Amino acid sequence: MAIGLNVTEPEVSCADTNCPFHGSLSVRGQTLEGTVASTDMDKTVIVEREYDVRVPKYDRLMKRRSRIPAHAPPCVDLAEGDTVRIAETRPLSKTKSHVVVEQIDTGGAE
């Protein structure tokens, strides 16, 4: 089932209702890329994005990071260090409003 994004669908099927491929979850809004920082929670990963912010006083760049909780469907096998693409969706819980739609690259630790 197509979700309206140019991503590769997972080969494994799942029975998760909050899966954009095999369930009824619709995606809309932003699509972001980041690195999986934590997989400790059940069906949830923390995606970390680093970016630079200019500090005008010192005329330098400062590193910042954002940590976004995202739903990880069972059909997408993730590990810490993987590069993933996440898409915005309706609020799934108090903090989750994104879902993992594609695993771009593995972290190399296999």
UniProtKB/Swiss-Prot annotation:
Top-level taxonomic group: Archaea
Cellular component, GO, one term: cytosolic small ribosomal subunit
Keyword Magnesium: no
InterPro entries with a match to the protein in the record: NA-bd_OB-fold, Ribosomal_uS17, Ribosomal_uS17_arc/euk, Ribosomal_uS17_archaeal, Ribosomal_uS17_CS
GO molecular function list: rRNA binding; structural constituent of ribosome
GO BP of this protein: translation
Alphabetized UniProt keyword annotations: Ribonucleoprotein, Ribosomal protein, RNA-binding, rRNA-binding
Pfam families named in the record: Ribosomal_S17 (PF00366)
Subunit record text: Part of the 30S ribosomal subunit.
Matching PANTHER family: 40S RIBOSOMAL PROTEIN S11 FAMILY MEMBER (PTHR10744), 40S RIBOSOMAL PROTEIN S11-RELATED (PTHR10744:SF9)
HAMAP family reported in the protein's UniProt record: Ribosomal_uS17_A
Protein family per UniProt: Belongs to the universal ribosomal protein uS17 family.
Physiological role: One of the primary rRNA binding proteins, it binds specifically to the 5'-end of 16S ribosomal RNA.
Protein's name in the database: Small ribosomal subunit protein uS17
Protein source organism: Haloquadratum walsbyi (strain DSM 16790 / HBSQ001)
Gene coding for it: rps17
